[in-house]
Amino acid sequence: MATLKDQLIVNLLKEEQAPQNKITVVGVGAVGMACAISILMKDLADELALVDVMEDKLKGEMMDLQHGSLFLKTPKIVSSKDYCVTANSKLVIITAGARQQEGESRLNLVQRNVNIFKFIIPNIVKYSPHCKLLIVSNPVDILTYVAWKISGFPKNRVIGSGCNLDSARFRYLMGERLGVHALSCHGWVLGEHGDSSVPVWSGVNVAGVSLKSLNPELGTDADKEQWKEVHKQVVDSAYEVIKLKGYTSWAIGLSVADLAESIMKNLRRVHPISTMIKGLYGINEDVFLSVPCILGQNGISDVVKVTLTPEEEARLKKSADTLWGIQKELQF
């Protein structure tokens, strides 16, 4: 007796269902799921895989997303704690790790998360040896270094989400001050994602008009309008959100989907993201920091050389020294 399906559909072709644009998200906490929904809403993948160690939570999140399939254009959403589910991913996004507690610095998390990475990274490499790795877990600059070391991947394929979000926060706050949409407010926050990030005031502009040319004191203590408060708000904002709601999720999820779009569509847009910066700005260690990078299908193909003031360069170097001080003590 022919099944209903056989009566309805005549098959013309035995297909092997290999994904062409698969994305994996490791970690289905608030950040991982914000990344997942943002990626789904942007139609970036033909398959989305989720991995976590908490099996019930993982299955529940997968089912919840699958039930939204009618409203999405990603035909396959899968999950497992077994990394075989991640096979043949183009992009693997790592959000797993210990969460930052209220008042805890991102650097404090480091050894807890290194131990988690020692398990995750080799599994990713085993099943997707040609993928790009996008690290989101904090402290992101150090963990991007850790992922690079453990994976053995070339540095172009190991990317930290870095200051993409810090710069987005900066542009939003700048826009709020000026009454202009963030897209039309340009400014870059570079260096460490977190407390020692560096705002590049010389490049801050609207429509190519440098704000520093109008206010030479911009970003200094002498500035009557105290624009450096904008950068202070960027640094404090995550702590404030964590204090208010327990964690941050939506903005980082959107920021990660923005990076995923540049990679999956080979856009070659410039983003402030964490890359191996050895040889730039007088930095001689294997340190990952955010600088403007051209991002496309091969990951980070080029770095834009930003002209920094001596003070900005010194701050970048100090960040690098801080990070290296922690990195050289790590056990892995």
Swiss-Prot record:
Family annotation (InterPro entries): L-lactate/malate_DH (IPR001557), L-lactate_DH (IPR011304), L-lactate_DH_AS (IPR018177), Lactate/malate_DH_C (IPR022383), Lactate/malate_DH_N (IPR001236), Lactate_DH/Glyco_Ohase_4_C (IPR015955), NAD(P)-bd_dom_sf (IPR036291)
Posttranslational mods: ISGylated.
Reactions the enzyme catalyzes: (S)-lactate + NAD(+) = pyruvate + NADH + H(+)
Modification sites for N6-acetyllysine: 5, 14, 57, 81, 118, 126, 224, 232, 243, 318
Residue list for modification Phosphotyrosine: 239
GO BP of this protein: glucose catabolic process to lactate via pyruvate; lactate biosynthetic process from pyruvate; pyruvate catabolic process
Keywords associated with the record: Acetylation, Cytoplasm, Isopeptide bond, NAD, Oxidoreductase, Phosphoprotein, Ubl conjugation
Record cross-link Glycyl lysine isopeptide (Lys-Gly) (interchain with G-Cter in SUMO2), residues: 57
N-acetylalanine PTM positions: 2
Subunit record text: Homotetramer. Interacts with PTEN upstream reading frame protein MP31.
Family indicated by similarity: Belongs to the LDH/MDH superfamily. LDH family.
HAMAP family attached to this UniProt entry: Lactate_dehydrog
Record protein name field: L-lactate dehydrogenase A chain
Organism (species): Mus musculus (Mouse)
Name of the gene: Ldha
